[in-house]
Amino acid sequence: MGGSGSRLSKELLAEYQDLTFLTKQEILLAHRRFCELLPQEQRSVESSLRAQVPFEQILSLPELKANPFKERICRVFSTSPAKDSLSFEDFLDLLSVFSDTATPDIKSHYAFRIFDFDDDGTLNREDLSRLVNCLTGEGEDTRLSASEMKQLIDNILEESDIDRDGTINLSEFQHVISRSPDFASSFKIVL
């Protein structure tokens, strides 16, 4: 990345370390990868910290390309008014939550937000159906039939919907996730 103007200041690095679960090296790597997505004229530290990278470019990163929830991940972490791009700080937040050192509570909170497709604060039947379709694919050979989908969602709600209101709230989701030892290790993105 070259000259003295192309590195994050020690103060900014320290601030990002305090606010994320990332190490200094991970933050520097994240900044380098973010800058690679920018036009040449926006790659200075000052410009890169103000820049917004469109989702199409973020989604081209190999670390996200194969993730079935990639669009939702970008939407959840985007602070842009149109929810169609990520700033460097949005990108850092994303990487922080998906890092090995993020707490299980943080990971489950963001997983819940990613799976809450309609952003209403609960996982309802439609959210669960979309979740299953993301995981199984929407091809003819992998898509569940309507009856299979209904049975699966009924089973999920039977196991997870503690208050029996027909939806899964955050605490119910976190309760289920707490019984899944592989969740934290599988909910990660490494640059």
Swiss-Prot record:
Expression (tissue specificity): Ubiquitously expressed. Expressed in the epidermis, hair follicles and keratinocytes. Detected in platelets and in cell lines of megakaryocytic and erythrocytic lineages. Both isoform 1 and isoform 2 are detected in various cancer cell lines, with isoform 2 being the predominant form (at protein level).
Alphabetically ordered keywords of this record: Angiogenesis, Apoptosis, Calcium, Cell adhesion, Cell cycle, Cell division, Cell membrane, Cell projection, Cytoplasm, Cytoskeleton, Differentiation, Golgi apparatus, Lipoprotein, Magnesium, Membrane, Metal-binding, Myristate, Nucleus, Phosphoprotein, Repeat, Spermatogenesis
Gene Ontology molecular function, alphabetical: calcium ion binding; calcium-dependent protein kinase inhibitor activity; magnesium ion binding; protein serine/threonine kinase inhibitor activity; protein-membrane adaptor activity; small GTPase binding; transmembrane transporter binding
Entry's transmembrane regions: none
Major localization class: membrane
Record's GO cellular component terms: apical plasma membrane; axon; cell periphery; centrosome; cytoplasm; endoplasmic reticulum; extracellular exosome; filopodium tip
Residues covalently joined to lipid (N-myristoyl glycine): G2
Membrane topology: Lipid-anchor
Binding locations of Ca(2+) 2: D161, D163, D165, T167, E172
GO biological process: angiogenesis; apoptotic process; cell adhesion; cell division; cellular response to growth factor stimulus; cellular response to nerve growth factor stimulus; cellular response to tumor necrosis factor; cytoplasmic microtubule organization
Induction (UniProt): Up-regulated during breast cancer progression.
Pfam families xrefs: EF-hand_7
CDD domains given in the database record: EFh
Subcellular location: Membrane; Cell membrane, Sarcolemma; Cell membrane; Apical cell membrane
Key word Isomerase present: no
InterPro entries: CIBP (IPR051433), EF-hand-dom_pair (IPR011992), EF_Hand_1_Ca_BS (IPR018247), EF_hand_dom (IPR002048)
Binding site for Ca(2+) 1: D116, D118, D120, T122, D127
Known outcome of mutating G2A: Inhibits translocation to the plasma membrane. Increased apoptosis after TNF stimulation
Domain EF-hand intervals: 103-138, 148-183
Reported effect, I153A: Loss of binding to ITGA2B
Associated disorder: Epidermodysplasia verruciformis 3: A form of epidermodysplasia verruciformis, a rare genodermatosis associated with a high risk of skin carcinoma that results from an abnormal susceptibility to infection by specific human papillomaviruses, including the oncogenic HPV5. Infection leads to the early development of disseminated flat wart-like and pityriasis versicolor-like skin lesions. Cutaneous Bowen's carcinomas in situ and invasive squamous cell carcinomas develop in about half of the patients, mainly on sun-exposed skin areas. EV3 inheritance is autosomal recessive.
Role, per record: Calcium-binding protein that plays a role in the regulation of numerous cellular processes, such as cell differentiation, cell division, cell proliferation, cell migration, thrombosis, angiogenesis, cardiac hypertrophy and apoptosis. Involved in bone marrow megakaryocyte differentiation by negatively regulating thrombopoietin-mediated signaling pathway. Participates in the endomitotic cell cycle of megakaryocyte, a form of mitosis in which both karyokinesis and cytokinesis are interrupted. Acts as a restriction factor that promotes keratinocyte-intrinsic immunity to human beta-papillomaviruses (HPVs).
Additional information: The binding of either calcium or magnesium significantly increases the structural stability of the protein in comparison to apo-CIB (calcium- and magnesium-free form).
Entry domain remark: The EF-hands may also bind magnesium ions in the presence of high Mg(2+) levels and low Ca(2+) levels.
Protein name, entry field: Calcium and integrin-binding protein 1
Organism: Homo sapiens (Human)
